[in-house]
Amino acid sequence: MATGTPDSQARFGQSVKGLLTEKVNTCGTDVIALTKQVLKGSRSSELLGQAARNMVLQEDAILHSEDSLRKMAIITTHLQYQQEAIQKNVEQSPDLQDQLSHLLK
C-alpha cells in the first residue's frame, strides 16, 4: 500500500477488520445452518429406515395372515365334509332304528 497518513491507515485497518468480522459471522451462521440441515437429513434417514423396517414387519404379518386364512379355509372345507357325513347318518338313523326294531320282533 502506498504511504498514507496514519489516520487513513487506521481507518483502512478498521474497515478490513470490520469486513473480516462480518465474513466470520456470516461463515459461522452458514456453518450453523449447514449443521442443522445435516442433522435434519440424518434424522430423515433414520425415519426412512424405521419406516422401511416397519413396512417389512407389516409385510411379514400380512403373509402370516394369508397363510392362516388358507389353513382356515382348508379346515372349513373339512368341517363341511364332516357335517355332511353327520347329516347323512342322522337322516339314515330312523331307517336303521326301524330295521333294528323289526329284526328284534
From Swiss-Prot:
GO cellular component terms, semicolon-separated: BORC complex; cytoplasmic side of lysosomal membrane; lysosome
UniProt GO BP: axon development; lysosome localization; motor behavior; neuromuscular process; organelle transport along microtubule; regulation of endosome size; regulation of lysosome size; response to cycloheximide
Membrane as UniProt keyword: yes
Assigned keywords, A-Z: Lysosome, Membrane
Domain of life the protein comes from: Eukaryota
Location relative to the cell: Lysosome membrane
Entry coiled-coil feature ranges: none
Task performed by this protein: As part of the BORC complex may play a role in lysosomes movement and localization at the cell periphery. Associated with the cytosolic face of lysosomes, the BORC complex may recruit ARL8B and couple lysosomes to microtubule plus-end-directed kinesin motor.
Quaternary structure annotation from Swiss-Prot or TrEMBL: Component of the BLOC-one-related complex (BORC) which is composed of BLOC1S1, BLOC1S2, BORCS5, BORCS6, BORCS7, BORCS8, KXD1 and SNAPIN.
Record-stated family: Belongs to the BORCS7 family.
The name this protein goes by in its record: BLOC-1-related complex subunit 7
Higher taxonomy: Eukaryota, Metazoa, Chordata, Craniata, Vertebrata
Primary gene name: Borcs7
